[in-house]
Amino acid sequence: MFLALDIGNTNITVGLFAMKDKKVLPEPLKVWIMSTVKERTFDEYATLLMNMLFYDGFDAKQLSNFAVASVVPSLNAVFEELIKKYFGEKTFFVNSKNCGGLVFAAGNSKETGADRIANVVAAYSVYGDSCIVIDFGTATTFDCINSEGIYIGGAIAPGPSISARLLNLKTEQLPRVEVKKPLKSIGLTTVECMQSGLYFGYTGLVKELIARIKNEMKIKHIIATGGLAGLMFDEIEEIEIILPYLTLSGVRIVWEKVI
């Protein structure tokens, strides 16, 4: 079996894939999510992983291939050691060199996050045409690939959860609130006002960036992924579809192309 890991700043998404004739099947058998905690040791992460496998009826001994897209460099060695110690295997890391042949138009490709690489590789694999991939995570990333499969670049904005947290941390009177769609834009309470600003202000940000990107290049498809994609989907009509496991799929595809 094949294990793909998307190590983000808030969560680590783990996808288990079956293999047949040395090829990874496209749909994950199971997906788990664990919190990203930089202080955890590889033994602690291994315990979590083994427990998830065990309780869902999977045999850890059947795992033989591992690939990681990480935007938390401090955890790379942790998972590399985990996989080496508990499974006796090497870890494949998605990066600008291990990118499955993705061509970068310009700029410093070394700075492009592994999750962003995985996202555009997966999107182009699905559509074979120009796309914007919007990943609603800790940060919200916009990544553009053209009809020739060349990665053009994109934009990065703070995610709504970060904005909500900072409003609470950097002020004395504003509470910490859940990011949710309010019933109307004019709030009556402080919480309602904050939720209006966070939700409608944020969806406005996304719509504006989509419009500006479309003014600069031809776009056929707009895809969303990430933890808050479902919350934003109804308000942003430009988004065509949500693909919740896009990053894991990209990790799988890159691994197959390189290995």
From Swiss-Prot:
Q: How is the cofactor bound?
A: A monovalent cation. Ammonium or potassium.
Quote the record's binding site residues for ATP: D6, I7, G8, N9, T10, N11, I12, T13, T138
Active site, renumbered:
D115 (proton acceptor)
Q: What class of enzyme is it?
A: transferase
**Amino acids binding K(+):** D135
Q: Is the keyword Nuclease assigned to this protein?
A: no
- Asked whether the UniProt record includes Acyltransferase among its keywords, one would answer no
Give the chief site where it resides. Answer: cytoplasm
Its pathway is: Cofactor biosynthesis; coenzyme A biosynthesis; CoA from (R)-pantothenate: step 1/5
Q: Where in the cell is it found?
A: Cytoplasm
InterPro entries in the record? ATPase_NBD, Type_III_PanK
Recorded hits in Pfam families, A to Z, give: Pan_kinase
GO biological process: what's one of them?
A: coenzyme A biosynthetic process
Q: Which GO terms describe its molecular function?
A: ATP binding; metal ion binding; pantothenate kinase activity
The positions annotated for binding substrate are: G113, A114, D115, R116, T190
Q: Name one GO cellular component term.
A: cytoplasm
The UniProt record lists the EC number as 2.7.1.33
Q: What PANTHER family has UniProt attached to this entry? A: TYPE III PANTOTHENATE KINASE (PTHR34265:SF1)
Quote the subunit structure annotation: Homodimer.
Q: What does this protein do?
A: Catalyzes the phosphorylation of pantothenate (Pan), the first step in CoA biosynthesis.
Cited HAMAP family: Pantothen_kinase_3 (MF_01274)
This chain belongs to which protein, by name? Type III pantothenate kinase
Q: Which organism is it from?
A: Endomicrobium trichonymphae
Give the organism's phylogenetic lineage.
Bacteria, Pseudomonadati, Elusimicrobiota, Endomicrobiia, Endomicrobiales
Gene name? coaX
